[in-house]
Amino acid sequence: MRKHLNDLYKQIEKFPKTSGCYKMYSKDNKILYIGKAKNLRSRVKNYFSKRTSHKTKILMNNVTNIEIITTNSEYEALLLECNLIKKYKPTYNIKLKDDKGYPMIRITCEKYPRIFKTRKIINDGSEYFGPYVNVKNLDLVLDLINKTFKTKKCKKKSKNPCLYFHMGQCLGVCYREDLEDEYRKEIEQIKHILNGNISKLLNDIEIKMKEVIMKENFEAAIKLKETKKSLIEISQTQIITKIDKLSEDYLYIHKTNSLNTIVILKYKDGKLTEKDIHFDESIYEEDELIEKFITQYYTSPNMIVPDKIHIFKKIDTSNITKLINELKNIKTEIIYKETQDNIKIIEMATSNAKLALITYNHEKNKAIENLKTILEMKKLPKTIEGFDIAHINGYKTVASLVTFKMGKPFKDGYRVYKINSLSNGEIDDCKAIKEVISRRYSKLINEQLKLPDLILIDGGKGQLNAAYSILKGLRIEEKIAICALAKKEEIIFLPNKNQGIKLQKRNSALQVLQNVRDEAHRRANNFNNKLHNNIKLNYTKIKGIGEQKAKKILKVLGTYKDILLLNEDEIATKMKINITMANKIKKFAEEQNLNNKQNNHI
């Protein structure tokens, strides 16, 4: 079995033993095959059997990833499979010519509604139930409904009662106009049954079965038994298809201590067509996370906003609804409703969120193992510390340290440093790297704290050698692995190796390193900007200096130390201000410089 198939097999071991659909992807992220299963783990495992056909083996040689969507029943899986195949038209699926769809039960919107089987949806106010995969079951249940309840079968009015009235299967609404209340009660009972409330009807069938068996009418007993089975199967709520001519999204968030999994189930023209998964590491509380995610997700430029956005808990959404509608120039609703259908859909979203988290963690673990192999490490890089340097034209140089554990950010391990070894205006990333590496690991050694498994430097060979020289000086180069990742080329550099390592963009090990590098870069820049902004805001404390002029002082004159190198005339000339204001700026810089005697480690 090829390596990629081994990796896939490990992924499948995490699949649940529940019903659902699976999508098989190629290396270029194209869907090759879509299938459904009663037991996802068991079904997908079958593709790895030695007894599979030649065509299946060709398929599996091209599959690099398998994504699944769990459902609440096998029926739902079958319907979802149908919808997905129609949407994506995968290479290895049969192209079906018959696209008439599955039948449904229609209750018309007439004064005296009729009930019948249909495959066509008419948006006239009629109510629909289904669709139903097993047509035989549907026919048996419709026959039971028609015999149990006195519903209208005729389309036209008549002066005389119809045949069904004489058979006791019609109230006589075809010739009478005074039966509206009584007829409405019949219809409500039928809807009650079609919504899954079948216990009373099942009890009636049991009684009838005993009666016909007593009379030795075994043929009738067999039919009643089949009807009972059909009623049970058909009562399973078919939530994959919602008979609404609109688009709806259902959002669910599964929170854990380290990660939030966000699932959006997308319905279009009444059909579940897509699942969108997002992972979030923010520290927002649940209500705030719902609000923040909806705002960012639905206001993004290319996002098509649905008619309705269903959420899984009640919160105030008036402001974000208004914001989305104004920005997108649409009219959408963000709603929370505890209907039976909505609860079922949220249950499905919950199941998919939990499964996505398992898959995500599995992929992270696989990436860490991959990274160990590529970097030729002796142990897994479970803890990675990443460093980056930031400055603005050599001023206020800072360093950042970020920590990742098993491929995920560990915020408690974040640090920022002010670099002391460089004077203002001096640009030397290697010297800055040496300082921060020395400060960080001298502290860990002195305090006998645990060392990371891997150090990542944002930069190239020069920055790597600078950091490695410090590790050698501390005599810990054998205890910690170290590498550098260059930005544009995305080349990995290792100590004592002339050639860098170039990985494919989709390589999971590279993605882990990129995440660490990008987070260190973000953290360093944020801290550097904060320091510059603090100086700018401090300048506004000078009487007569507003925010715009403070910004100009920082840009033209620089930091407090830079100002101390200038005399009042030079300040006045550079800033194009009078000597009095120049004196104020010089005096303020002297005061601030004296007050700035503080620890550089934040």
UniProtKB/Swiss-Prot annotation:
InterPro entries: GIY-YIG_endonuc (IPR000305), GIY-YIG_endonuc_sf (IPR035901), GIY-YIG_UvrC_Cho (IPR047296), RuvA_2-like (IPR010994), UvrABC_protein_C (IPR050066), UvrC (IPR004791), UvrC_RNase_H_dom (IPR001162), UvrC_RNase_H_dom_sf (IPR038476). Residues 199-234 form the UVR domain. The keyword tRNA-binding does not apply. One of its GO terms (biological process) is nucleotide-excision repair. The keyword Kinase does not apply. Keywords: Cytoplasm, DNA damage, DNA excision, DNA repair, Excision nuclease, SOS response. GO terms for cellular component: cytoplasm; excinuclease repair complex. It is found in: Cytoplasm. It comes from the Bacteria. Residues 17-94 form the GIY-YIG domain. Gene3D superfamilies: 5' to 3' exonuclease, C-terminal subdomain, GIY-YIG endonuclease, UvrC, RNAse H endonuclease domain. One of its GO terms (molecular function) is DNA binding. Belongs to the UvrC family. Interacts with UvrB in an incision complex. HAMAP family: UvrC. The UvrABC repair system catalyzes the recognition and processing of DNA lesions. UvrC both incises the 5' and 3' sides of the lesion. The N-terminal half is responsible for the 3' incision and the C-terminal half is responsible for the 5' incision. This is UvrABC system protein C. It comes from Borrelia duttonii (strain Ly).
